[in-house]
């Protein structure tokens, strides 16, 4: 059975503005069903959505049993006002508002909390993020509150300091995880945090002509080196494509190939352990 631990049903892999516009009035069942059919045909039995504020992931969860798929969603991902994430998530101005938004997601049937606590990679410049991560104490409080409310936490997080803070708070999964150092890898391992590296968002950019090839190759190589180190430590890894992101179509199988390049012959055993942890936590 194939699994994808990070998708966005609201997006289509081509035009994020157009994709969101498609569902802005209400989730479009025809699109969602076609996408679920694709996953079913490819043998996917478990999907974990990264969330959206228009209810598309929520509707996909309702329809997924028709296709024999276990579907998990946070409903709306939560981000700090004025920082990365507001294009798809609900911005929050205070921790009090954060608690309110968690409550609203709970009423909508959320399975877990998704927080966005850093910027994203600049695919033209190796080592550069679009913005720094949130302060460590704030990250720790966001994770603590969600756990206190009974939810596991999925965190969009890049950069070593951001991931260290999240892992110290025992975040349940880290998504992306670009530019980590040994301290960050050890912190995730010790916390039992599952790393979902979404290599497809990098590897699928090669040869497209949109970004600097040298930078893309360097970013991918860095991520794969860190994955190998994390696996050697006994860290938990799970496959997630970030399907719906540009050049990452729904049903993409590239993640398994890219993880295999990094992890070698142990890839299946390593991913089985990580997937078991994801399904237990989420």
Predicted regions and their residues:
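Active-site environment of divalent metal-dependent phosphoester hydrolases
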Residues: 8-12, 53-57, 79-81, 119-123, ...
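Metal-associated gating/positioning segment near the N- to mid-region
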Residues: 2-63, 84
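Divalent metal-dependent hydrolysis catalytic cores, especially in the metallo-beta-lactamase
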Residues: 29-58, 68-78, 110-124, 152, ...
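Acidic/histidine-rich helix-loop elements
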Residues: 10-26, 81-92, 124-132, 206-215
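Histidine/acidic residue-rich metal-binding segments in metalloenzymes
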Residues: 96-116, 122-195, 216-237, 269
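Histidine/acidic-residue-rich catalytic or RNA/ligand-binding cores of hydrolases
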Residues: 13-17, 163-169, 202-213, 223, ...
């Amino acid at each position: 059975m194939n699994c994808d631990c990070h998708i966005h049903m609201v997006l289509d892999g081509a035009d994020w503005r157009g994709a969101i516009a498609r569902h802005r009035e209400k989730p479009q069942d025809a699109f969602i069903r076609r996408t679920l059919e694709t996953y079913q045909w490819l043998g996917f039995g478990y999907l974990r959505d990264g969330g959206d504020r228009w209810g598309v992931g929520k509707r996909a969860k309702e329809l997924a049993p028709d296709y024999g798929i276990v579907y998990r969603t946070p409903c709306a991902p939560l981000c700090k006002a004025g920082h990365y994430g507001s294009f798809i998530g609900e911005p929050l101005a205070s921790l009090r508002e954060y608690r309110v938004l968690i409550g609203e997601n709970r009423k909508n049937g959320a399975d877990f909390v998704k927080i966005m606590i850093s910027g994203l990679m600049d695919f033209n410049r190796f080592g550069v993020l679009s913005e720094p991560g949130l302060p460590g104490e704030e990250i720790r409080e966001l994770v603590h509150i969600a756990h206190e409310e009974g939810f596991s936490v999925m965190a969009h997080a890049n950069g070593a300091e951001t991931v260290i803070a999240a892992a110290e708070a025992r975040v349940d999964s880290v998504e992306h995880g670009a530019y980590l150092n040994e301290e960050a890898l050890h912190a995730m391992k010790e916390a039992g945090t599952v790393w979902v590296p979404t290599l497809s968002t990098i590897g699928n950019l090669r040869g497209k002509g949109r970004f600097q090839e040298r930078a893309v190759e360097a970013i991918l190589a860095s991520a794969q080196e860190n994955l190998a180190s994390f696996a050697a430590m006994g860290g938990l890894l799970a496959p997630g494509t970030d399907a719906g992101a540009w050049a990452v179509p729904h049903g993409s199988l590239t993640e398994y190939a890219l993880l295999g390049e990094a992890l070698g012959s142990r890839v299946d055993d390593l991913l089985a352990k990580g997937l078991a942890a994801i399904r237990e936590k989420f």
